[in-house]
């Protein structure tokens, strides 16, 4: 659910700090490039004031999608001849296109995770915005209100165990029975707001990430009172919300031994909350599992959690920036889970400076100097090899995790074509790593015809002797419209002997299956795509995640629900390979 300069989207993918920082010109209806600053308007004469009053159309014009700028020299864009480019728009009746895979089943979001209100005057919309912490709804364009409110119920990531699927949501978790994927059924919903709902499961334990300031220790839906609006002249100042003893930001742990009745057994607080987390199983430790916590949001007040500091390292060597957190979870006593270390994975080993890495300069930062990397967005582990790949905003990291409490950096890379290092996947043999770039934060249209195919793409690296070397890029080949948020996002390997194949979500770009066996020449072998949710305005939707599990592919559709797919034989993938 980082990082674009759009007037409409000054917000990280998953709200996180955005709920505190939310301004009227924030979300969902995206102006794709910053507009030139308008000239100061002259005061209209008295008889012109009525005519100057904005109409609903006028107030939304600022948020209308804009086409991409011309391609930079030497860059190529996406294919407008692909049939995915012109699919009909619609929420549940959009056009569809597929190759090498078929759609098996679809379930709409369960009731607790849907906001059916569409009118900005609906009391439920106002209530939801209040729970999100929106400071001053009166300044928000009226037609934008129900769309922003929908973000409180966005679907996010998946976890699997046995015949159960756990689908995270900004409002909690849905648990499904997938014993028969073609007849997937909802078992229960766990209402527990706080976003973004990144989930993982181990035995009878379910872990969920929470980073938004409306999260409560008791999973209550009432949130907290919005912060008072800033005083005149201080509108641009940003501060963490006032301390609340019942606020929760970190990793929740549930006992799901009774699958229809999950019980929270622990809630481990962290200074920046948990944007994502990664389950780490140590082959040499059967009594504990470990959670790597990636926090990308603001640092909370020390009055709310002792020891939290958002200062730069030069002012406070104990800053909560420039680190990850490690939680140790005793499997037999999860209520005793706690943070046991906060590794400084960005440190300069020569000088000891905590801010030892930077992005090297990025194409979307203009003339800005290289920015220090102070957070990881997501970490992928390969426990059998004792390695982890960290996608850490400005850098891709390779970590030694043989001692899971004290991971050590082996290598770090950056790339001027990358805006925000988002996630990573190892090849099955551990000789390649695929990193993703979430250019636009997942909230912008970044697969338009003139969007370069090296921006918002996968970067495929060789991994040799603990060093990463770039081999190539891969981006969804088909162009997408101005009203479809689209960029590289979450995926997983598909186990085909002798080949490296990954299924991957691209938000409203749909699902693309990539063969990267030859790391220098990746290519698409299957896809499924729907048309945009809306033909005229960019409404956040599409696949957050696409994962292969036991012969099926599951898609977590942000706005619509849950999809089930199967690969089909094609010139790229034989029946024997599918059955292997």
Residue ranges and their predicted role:
Residues 8-9, 22, 416:
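Residues at the start of alpha-helices and the adjacent loop-to-helix junctions
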Residues 12-25:
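Bacterial N-terminal signal peptides
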């Amino acid at each position: 659910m980082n990082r674009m300069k759009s007037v409409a989207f000054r917000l990280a993918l998953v709200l996180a700090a955005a709920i505190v920082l939310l301004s009227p010109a924030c979300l969902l209806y995206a102006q794709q490039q910053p507009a030139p600053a308008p000239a100061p308007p002259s005061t209209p004469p008295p008889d012109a004031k009525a005519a100057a009053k904005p109409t609903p159309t006028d107030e939304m014009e600022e948020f209308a999608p804009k086409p991409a700028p011309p391609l930079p020299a030497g860059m190529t864009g996406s294919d407008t001849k692909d049939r995915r480019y012109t699919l009909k728009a619609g929420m549940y009746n959009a056009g569809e296109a597929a190759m090498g895979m078929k759609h098996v089943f679809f379930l709409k979001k369960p009731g607790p995770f849907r906001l059916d209100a569409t009118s900005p005057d609906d009391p439920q919309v106002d209530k939801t915005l209040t729970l999100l912490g929106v400071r001053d709804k009166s300044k928000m364009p009226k037609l934008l209100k129900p769309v922003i409110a929908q973000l409180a119920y966005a679907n996010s990531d998946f976890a699997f165990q046995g015949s159960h699927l756990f689908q995270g949501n900004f409002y909690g978790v849905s648990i499904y029975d997938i014993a028969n994927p073609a007849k997937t059924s909802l078992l229960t919903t766990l209402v527990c707001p706080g976003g973004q709902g990144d989930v993982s499961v181990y035995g009878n334990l379910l872990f969920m990430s929470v980073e938004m300031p409306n999260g409560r220790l008791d999973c209550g839906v009432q949130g907290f009172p919005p912060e008072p609006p800033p005083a005149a002249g201080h509108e641009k100042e940003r501060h963490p919300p006032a301390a609340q003893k019942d606020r929760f930001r970190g990793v929740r742990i549930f006992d799901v031994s009774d699958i229809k009745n999950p019980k929270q057994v622990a809630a481990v607080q962290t200074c920046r909350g948990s944007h994502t987390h990664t389950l780490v199983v140590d082959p040499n430790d059967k009594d504990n599992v470990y959670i790597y916590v990636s926090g990308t949001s603001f640092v909370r007040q020390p009055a709310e959690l002792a020891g939290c500091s958002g200062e730069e390292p030069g002012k406070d060597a104990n800053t909560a920036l420039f680190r990850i957190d490690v939680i140790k979870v005793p499997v037999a006593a999860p209520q005793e889970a706690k943070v046991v270390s906060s590794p400084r994975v960005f440190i300069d080993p020569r000088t000891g400076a905590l801010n030892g890495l930077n992005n090297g300069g990025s194409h979307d930062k203009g003339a800005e100097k290289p920015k220090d990397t102070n957070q990881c967005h997501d970490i992928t582990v390969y426990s059998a090899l004792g390695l982890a790949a960290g996608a850490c905003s400005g850098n891709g990291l390779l970590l030694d995790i043989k001692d899971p409490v004290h991971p050590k950096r082996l290598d770090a890379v950056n790339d001027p074509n990358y805006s925000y290092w988002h996630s990573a996947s190892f090849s099955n043999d551990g000789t390649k790593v695929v990193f993703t770039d979430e250019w636009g934060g997942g909230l912008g249209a970044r697969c338009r015809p003139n969007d370069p195919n090296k921006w918002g793409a996968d970067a495929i690296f060789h991994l040799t002797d603990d060093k990463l070397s770039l081999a190539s890029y891969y981006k969804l080949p088909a162009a997408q419209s101005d009203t479809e948020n689209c960029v590289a996002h979450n995926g997983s390997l598909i186990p085909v002997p002798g080949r490296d194949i990954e299924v991957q979500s691209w938000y409203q770009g749909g699902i693309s299956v990539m063969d990267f066996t030859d790391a220098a020449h990746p290519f698409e072998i299957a896809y499924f795509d729907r048309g945009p949710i809306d033909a005229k305005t960019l409404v956040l939707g599409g696949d957050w995640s696409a994962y292969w599990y036991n012969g099926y592919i599951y898609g977590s559709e942000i706005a619509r629900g849950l999809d089930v797919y199967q690969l089909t034989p094609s010139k790229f993938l034989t029946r024997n390979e599918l059955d292997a």
